[in-house]
């Protein structure tokens, strides 16, 4: 949601007035939520411009009025969801210029400058160098006081000052003033509402003086001379109190601390501890070794017994194999002998047949 100033037409050209009325043509981009009511969309857009600095106008927009929609229908460009439309509007613009006389109400006083509010909203400042030399800053009351007339500049004082410089940033402007010209600038009144609003925030504390203690010292030093007087401020609740006893104690030289008891030296035999630890470690290692040996011997015995069992079984298997082999050989021999005998008988029969 954006706005762009297309053209500016100043209607009034005042010489000494810091407000200027301008007729402006604006190009607005309204979001899709304002499709049902374009008037409410333009109003919310213009409300965002109020009390903001615009470089095209050269000042701060104070108010707007006479809004006219020049387009009957809103336009949508390409694939943008925003609604484009043009309007004419009148702006009241605050445009201070150099050497102009403005009135402001003091909202803060410090040793370096005075801060003011112009028309209740716009900030301005007057540095100490631009304040008349007859005014001096009083730390006890936190205000500038005229030595001759006893006039004071405090929170809530109305001042007429001359504009020296106007600096602008993105949204605001800063005004720097001067009140050394006594013919056109100076104190013009007091605003009690502003003093109640800002006065309690910037009180400076004063150092309290204990009356009894210093009066005694003063009487002893002056020997009856009553030229110096001290004000008793113990009953004043608005003044913060500071203790001077702590300052005196800090000025005194520190007393040395004497230690009567001799420090005891604690001897630690690190080697003996190490030896003990080693012996314990050796004992534990021996025990572990013995246990390991026993376990290994048991394992060996088991393995040997298993091996012996296996060897006996192998022997039995081998013997059975040999017996089987021998029996198989004998059977084969018998078969051969029988086969040979049969063959011989056959031959004999054949011979007989031939003879016949």
Curated annotation (Swiss-Prot):
InterPro entries the UniProt entry points to: NA-bd_OB-fold, RNA_pol_Rpb7-like_N_sf, RNAP_I_Rpa43_N, Rpb7-like, Rpb7-like_N, S1_domain
Region (Disordered), start-end ranges: 211-356
Keywords: DNA-directed RNA polymerase, Nucleus, Transcription
Induction summary: Up-regulated by phagocytic stimuli.
Domain of life: Eukaryota
Family of this protein: Belongs to the eukaryotic RPA43 RNA polymerase subunit family.
GO cellular component, as recorded: RNA polymerase I complex
Protein name: Probable DNA-directed RNA polymerase I subunit RPA43
Entries under Pfam families matching the protein: S1 (PF00575), SHS2_Rpb7-N (PF03876)
Gene designation: rpa43
Single GO biological process annotation from the record: transcription elongation by RNA polymerase I
UniProt feature, compositional bias: Low complexity: 211-238
Coiled coil: none
GO molecular function, one term: nucleic acid binding
Localization per Swiss-Prot or TrEMBL: Nucleus, Nucleolus
Biased composition, class Basic and acidic residues, residue ranges: 253-297
Keyword Nucleus recorded: yes
SUPFAM superfamilies: Nucleic acid-binding proteins (SSF50249)
Role: DNA-dependent RNA polymerase catalyzes the transcription of DNA into RNA using the four ribonucleoside triphosphates as substrates. Component of RNA polymerase I which synthesizes ribosomal RNA precursors.
Subunit structure: Component of the RNA polymerase I (Pol I) complex.
Location (main, coarse): nucleus
Keyword Zinc-finger among record annotations: no
């Amino acid at each position: 949601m954006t706005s762009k100033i297309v053209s500016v037409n100043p209607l009034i050209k005042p010489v000494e007035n810091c407000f200027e009325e301008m007729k402006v043509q604006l190009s607005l981009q309204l979001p899709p939520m304002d499709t049902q009511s374009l008037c409410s969309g333009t109003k919310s857009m213009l409300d965002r411009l109020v009390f903001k600095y615009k470089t095209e106008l050269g000042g701060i927009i104070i108010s707007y009025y006479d809004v006219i929609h020049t387009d009957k229908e809103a336009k949508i460009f390409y694939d943008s969801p925003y609604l484009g439309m043009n309007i004419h509007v009148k702006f009241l613009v605050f445009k201070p210029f150099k050497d102009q006389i403005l009135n402001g109400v003091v909202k803060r006083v410090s040793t370096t400058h005075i801060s003011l509010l112009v028309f209740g909203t716009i900030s301005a400042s007057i540095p100490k160098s631009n304040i008349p030399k007859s005014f001096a800053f009083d730390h006890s009351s936190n205000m500038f006081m005229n030595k001759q007339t006893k006039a004071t500049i405090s929170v809530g004082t109305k001042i007429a000052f001359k504009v020296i410089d106007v600096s602008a940033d993105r949204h605001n402007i800063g005004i720097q003033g001067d009140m050394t010209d006594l013919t056109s600038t100076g104190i013009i009144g007091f605003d009690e509402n502003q003093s109640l609003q800002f006065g309690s925030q910037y009180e400076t504390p004063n150092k309290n003086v204990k009356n009894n203690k210093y009066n005694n010292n003063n009487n002893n030093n002056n020997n009856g001379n009553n030229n110096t007087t001290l004000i008793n401020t113990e009953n004043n609740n608005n003044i913060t109190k500071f203790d001077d006893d702590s300052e005196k104690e800090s000025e005194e030289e520190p007393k040395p601390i004497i230690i009567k008891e001799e420090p005891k030296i604690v001897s630690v035999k690190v080697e003996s501890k190490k030896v003990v630890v080693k012996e314990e470690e050796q004992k534990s290692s021996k025990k572990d070794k013995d246990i390991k040996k026993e376990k290994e011997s048991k394992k060996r015995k088991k393995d040997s017994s298993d091996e012996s069992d296996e060897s006996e079984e192998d022997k039995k298997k081998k013997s059975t194999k040999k017996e089987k082999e021998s029996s198989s050989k004998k059977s084969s021999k018998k078969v051969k002998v029988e086969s040979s005998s049969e063959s011989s008988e056959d031959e004999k029969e054949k011979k007989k047949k031939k003879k016949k």
